């Protein structure tokens, strides 16, 4: 056996046979051990050869394993290294001879299989008994390896290379496993034109992610199957090449190149009958290159592309095409670009209508046409970082999935009843242990109540199961209908018109009638527990879940809340009616849908002296909209006093440190597009900083340092300033005109002047500040009571027209907070006490004491 040259797979099989014989306690390795080993290999060629010979490899493997299990077992030290017996050696010799006849340099696993079948062993008898004779196996070689010779140690990776490393899209289209492609006729026609050229017949589809590049190729596969293509493409096979699986497991240098070459040779050998598709085309640049080798996949296919021997359709995004393909001009010139643009909202609705039935069948729900329109419109308006039709399809898919989950989950009424029944059952167990008369009477009543609740529960469960069964029936019928339609198309292509007539005029109308009856039963049910229809409201809920933007119809409670927005804001911001009304009107316009959808919800410049409530109003708006005053983007403009600091807002430009981190403003709004943005103390910033806000105020968009467009159309922009504070309204406006450029002022929705606070208004602020202090003390279970005289004292002493309400906060802190802290530390006041604050010593100070 010195001249025996096994391939890598054959060596692995021989090693596996040795290990199995050793583990089984067999004293020698027999042909059956080898047969089990070669059929058990994951990527082996022996199993496909048996299949080609008309034999089931799984049956042979199971029978061979039985033979191995029946061999005599021995014990001793030489069991760790059993030797091949005479029959096994004969099989190896026969396979070496056959390899020589075939012109192979190495013995591959399928040749070893033929060698086993040629011998006289129990394994050979098993193969012959199942029809896998030596001649049958030799004849099957042709279908697996063709005319290829084994000239390397890993030839198995090259046999049936196309089958291993590609997906036949035309086969999937024939089986009806590809979604229909709606529209895109122009792009498909252009692809067909390029493919029909004599040389450089290689179109590359370029477009943004999610616009439907791969779908165009799937549409081409469907057209090839339907025969709706020119003569040059009729009957051709369209395959999708999987470079990932080609690279995966290529352990040795040159192994990837061998696999790719085998694929390319098979494609060349098909004489133009195969059209190849590579998704993510940029991956061919650099794929397989290692160390000093420059021979990557891109360089290997260049000659074939230039000569027209390989018809290749590629798909990649604009950025990746520029980054990888355009750099290699020799590769780029071999491709013809086909630009795939984003479809319009109207075209997207058409695409969704074409896909609707597939999603209805998959999820077992109905999808309203108005829901498809809503998905296209809402995704276009609110999900700006992605592209149609992908984002609209995702919306419909998730909305249907959400509905299906609700159908499969137990309804709320049943959950509530089950909780009641469980509680009553626990009470019943507890009461059975009691012996007094009252407990026995209570037990009687409880058992009666429990019986009623159980009856109600079983009725509800039966109703739910019935409704669910009808919905499941519709789903089953629709799946059946889709299968019949696919079968009908296949029969029509094959010319079996009798079968077509039977399906189209018999079984399909019958099923459609059943579906209509079942859907009528669902629709006609009163007080239905389950909803099985995707409506625009469900789509809007999904949009809200994705973006945080309330896109759905307003509930009654929200309508009342919006109508009374001034009252809510007025509780926190005292004496600024004009400002509160301006902001409230902007929010109402946006939620009612009458605002300009291409501008921010509102943009305001708040002017006024310090401490009158400018920043407080921005916090109040955030609390009103998001139930949290901190849920806003706050930019302190005093940090942007230098010209270059604008880069902090939108992110550093390319080449600078921190380029990939994004800007403080743009990143915050990208993460949360529905928010309040507060630019505090704008007069402190450098004037050039406001130039970047011009596009935000006018078009609701801003481009960040990485070239991404950030959507500001659902934000409220509030700028605060105390320019001209202390002067008249006219003086304030003059100061604004001096500080800001006219084009900036002109883009604001409103400039709101805050009035100085009067002493009466300060009395209301005293109430607000004291209630905030009381809230902080509630953690220690302290109850705070401030007398009217003390409140008046605070309002008088805390009033300063130049500084607004801030001196009052300091006064409360000093007059009440400091004393209270000392009393708590001294133990005079303990947790849970009532605290009284009153005027003392003829109004000289406030006294804080425990109320008895």
From Swiss-Prot:
Keywords linked to the UniProt accession: ATP-binding, Chaperone, Coiled coil, Cytoplasm, Nucleotide-binding, Repeat, Stress response
A GO MF term: ATP hydrolysis activity
Positions of ATP 1 binding: 207-214
Coiled coil feature spans: 393-527
Region ranges (NBD1): 160-342
Chain spans, region NBD2: 558-756
Annotated TM spans: none
Region described as Repeat 2: spans on this chain: 84-147
GO BP annotation list: cellular response to heat; protein refolding
Primary localization class, coarse: cytoplasm
One Pfam family, short name: AAA_lid_9
Localization annotation: Cytoplasm
Region (C-terminal): 757-852
Annotated spans, Linker: 343-548
Every Clp R domain range: 1-147
InterPro entries named in the record: AAA+_ATPase (IPR003593), ATPase_AAA_core (IPR003959), Chaperonin_ClpB (IPR017730), Clp_ATPase_C (IPR019489), Clp_N_dom_sf (IPR036628), Clp_R_dom (IPR004176), ClpA/B (IPR001270), ClpA/B_CS1 (IPR018368)
Start and end residues of each stretch annotated as Repeat 1: 6-71
An annotated GO cellular component: cytoplasm
UniProt: ATP 2 binding residues: 608-615
Function according to Swiss-Prot or TrEMBL: Part of a stress-induced multi-chaperone system, it is involved in the recovery of the cell from heat-induced damage, in cooperation with DnaK, DnaJ and GrpE. Acts before DnaK, in the processing of protein aggregates. Protein binding stimulates the ATPase activity; ATP hydrolysis unfolds the denatured protein aggregates, which probably helps expose new hydrophobic binding sites on the surface of ClpB-bound aggregates, contributing to the solubilization and refolding of denatured protein aggregates by DnaK.
Subunit structure, interactors included: Homohexamer. The oligomerization is ATP-dependent.
Domain comment as written in the entry: The Clp repeat (R) domain probably functions as a substrate-discriminating domain, recruiting aggregated proteins to the ClpB hexamer and/or stabilizing bound proteins. The NBD2 domain is responsible for oligomerization, whereas the NBD1 domain stabilizes the hexamer probably in an ATP-dependent manner. The movement of the coiled-coil domain is essential for ClpB ability to rescue proteins from an aggregated state, probably by pulling apart large aggregated proteins, which are bound between the coiled-coils motifs of adjacent ClpB subunits in the functional hexamer.
Entries under PANTHER family matching the protein: ATP-DEPENDENT CLP PROTEASE (PTHR11638), HEAT SHOCK PROTEIN 104 (PTHR11638:SF18)
Sequence similarity: Belongs to the ClpA/ClpB family.
Protein name: Chaperone protein ClpB
Annotated organism of origin: Corynebacterium efficiens (strain DSM 44549 / YS-314 / AJ 12310 / JCM 11189 / NBRC 100395)
């Amino acid at each position: 056996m010195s001249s025996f040259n096994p391939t890598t797979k054959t060596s692995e099989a021989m090693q596996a046979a040795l290990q199995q014989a050793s583990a089984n306690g067999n004293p020698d390795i027999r042909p059956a051990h080898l047969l089990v080993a070669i059929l058990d290999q994951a990527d082996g060629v022996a199993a496909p050869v048996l299949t080609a010979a008309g034999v089931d490899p799984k049956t042979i493997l199971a029978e061979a394993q039985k033979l191995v299990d029946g061999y005599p077992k021995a014990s001793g030290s030489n069991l760790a290294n059993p030797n091949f017996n005479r029959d096994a050696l004969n099989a190896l010799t026969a396979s070496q001879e056959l390899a020589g006849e075939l012109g192979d340099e190495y013995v591959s696993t399928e040749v070893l299989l033929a060698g086993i079948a040629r011998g006289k062993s129990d394994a050979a008898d098993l193969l012959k008994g199942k029809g896998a004779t030596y001649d049958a196996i030799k004849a099957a070689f042709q279908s697996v390896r063709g005319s290829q010779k084994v000239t390397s140690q890993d030839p198995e990776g090259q046999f049936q290379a196309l089958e291993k490393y590609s997906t036949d899209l035309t086969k999937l289209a024939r089986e009806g496993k590809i979604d229909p492609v709606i529209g895109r006729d122009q792009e498909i026609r252009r692809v067909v034109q390029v493919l029909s050229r004599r040389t450089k017949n290689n179109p590359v589809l370029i477009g943004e992610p999610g616009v439907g590049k791969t779908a165009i190729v799937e549409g081409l596969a469907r057209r090839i199957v339907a025969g709706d293509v020119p003569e040059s493409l009729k009957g051709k096979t369209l395959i999708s090449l999987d470079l990932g699986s080609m690279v995966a497991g290529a352990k040795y240098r040159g192994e990837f190149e061998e696999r790719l070459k085998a694929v390319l040779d098979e494609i060349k050998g098909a004489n133009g009958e195969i059209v190849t598709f590579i998704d993510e085309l940029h991956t061919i640049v650099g794929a397989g290159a290692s160390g000093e080798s420059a021979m990557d996949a891109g360089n290997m296919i260049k000659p074939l592309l230039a000569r027209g021997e390989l018809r290749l359709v590629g798909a990649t995004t604009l950025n990746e095409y520029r980054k990888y393909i355009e750099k290699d001009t020799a590769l780029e010139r071999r491709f013809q670009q086909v630009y795939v643009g984003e479809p319009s909202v109207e075209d997207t609705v058409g695409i969704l209508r074409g896909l609707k039935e597939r999603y209805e069948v998959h999820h077992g729900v109905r999808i309203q046409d108005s829901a498809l329109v809503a998905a296209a419109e809402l995704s276009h308006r609110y999900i700006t970082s992605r592209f149609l039709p992908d984002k609209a399809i995702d919306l419909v898919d998730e909305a249907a999935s959400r509905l299906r989950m609700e159908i499969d989950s137990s309804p709320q009424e049943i959950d509530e009843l089950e909780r009641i029944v469980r509680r009553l059952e626990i009470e019943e167990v507890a009461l059975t242990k009691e012996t007094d008369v009252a407990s026995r009477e209570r037990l009687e009543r409880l058992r009666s109540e429990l019986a009623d609740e159980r009856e109600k529960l079983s009725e509800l469960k039966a109703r739910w199961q019935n409704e669910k069964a009808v919905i499941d029936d519709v789903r089953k019928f629709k799946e059946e209908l889709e299968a019949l339609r696919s079968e009908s198309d296949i029969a029509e292509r094959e010319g079996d018109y009798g079968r077509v007539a039977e399906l189209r005029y018999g079984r399909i109308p019958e099923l459609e009638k059943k579906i209509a009856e079942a859907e009528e039963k669902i629709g006609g049910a009163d007080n239905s527990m389950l909803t099985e229809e995707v409506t625009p409201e469900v789509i809007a809920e999904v949009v809200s879940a994705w973006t945080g933007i309330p896109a759905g119809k307003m509930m009654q409670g929200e309508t009342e809340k919006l109508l009374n927005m001034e009252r809510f804001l007025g509780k926190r911001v005292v004496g600024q009616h004009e400002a509160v009304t301006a902001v409230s009107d902007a929010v109402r316009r946006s939620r009612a849908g009458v605002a300009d959808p291409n501008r921010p919800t509102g943009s305001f410049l708040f002017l006024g002296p310090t401490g009158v409530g400018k920043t407080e109003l921005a916090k109040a708006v955030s609390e009103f909209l998001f139930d949290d005053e901190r849920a806003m983007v706050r930019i302190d403009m005093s940090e942007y006093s230098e010209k270059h600091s604008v880069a902090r807002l939108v992110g550093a430009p390319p080449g600078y440190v921190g380029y990939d981190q994004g800007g403080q403003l743009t990143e915050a709004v990208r993460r949360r597009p529905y928010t309040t943005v507060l630019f505090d103390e704008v007069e402190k910033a450098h004037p050039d900083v406001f130039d970047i806000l011009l596009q935000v105020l006018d078009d609701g968009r801003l481009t960040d340092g990485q070239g991404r467009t950030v959507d500001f159309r659902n934000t409220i922009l509030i700028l605060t300033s105390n320019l001209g504070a202390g002067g008249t309204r006219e003086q304030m406006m003059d100061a604004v005109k001096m500080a800001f450029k006219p084009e900036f002022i002109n883009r604001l929705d409103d400039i709101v002047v805050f009035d100085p606070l009067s002493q009466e208004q300060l009395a209301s602020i005293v109430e607000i500040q004291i209630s905030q202090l009381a809230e902080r003390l509630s953690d220690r279970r302290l109850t705070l009571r401030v007398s009217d005289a003390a409140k008046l004292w605070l309002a008088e002493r805390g009033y300063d027209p130049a500084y607004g309400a801030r001196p009052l906060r300091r006064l409360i802190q000093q007059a009440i907070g400091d004393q209270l802290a000392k009393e708590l530390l001294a133990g005079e006041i303990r947790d849970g006490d009532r605290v009284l604050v009153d005027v003392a010593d003829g109004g000289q100070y406030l006294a804080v004491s425990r109320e008895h």
